[in-house]
Amino acid sequence: MSYEKVLQAGKTVVGTKQTVRALKEGKALEVIVAEDADPSIIDKVMEAAKEANVPVTKVDSMKKLGKACKIQVGAAAVAIIR
C-alpha cells in the first residue's frame, strides 16, 4: 500500500538528509521509512517527523522503497511533499 502511495505521489524527496530537510522546512506531508534500514539513521527521521507532527508509515524493504521511487538502490526514507 505505501509503496503504491509513493508511486502515485506527485512530489517526493528520497533519502534521510532530504527527508529531514523537508520536515524541518514544513514541506513534508507524510514520511515513509524502511524497517530494514539502520536504526541510527532512521531515528533522526523519526525524531524530525515527531517534532513536525507528520505521520510516519513503515514499510519492510529499502530495496522495494527505492524501486517505488524509481531509483536503482535502496531508500531508507522518503517524504511525500507539498
Curated annotation (Swiss-Prot):
It comes from the Bacteria. Coiled coil: none annotated. Pfam families: Ribosomal_L7Ae. GO terms for molecular function: RNA binding. Keywords: RNA-binding. Belongs to the eukaryotic ribosomal protein eL8 family. NCBIfam families: PRK13602.1 (NF010125). This is RNA-binding protein GWCH70_0105. It comes from Geobacillus sp. (strain WCH70).
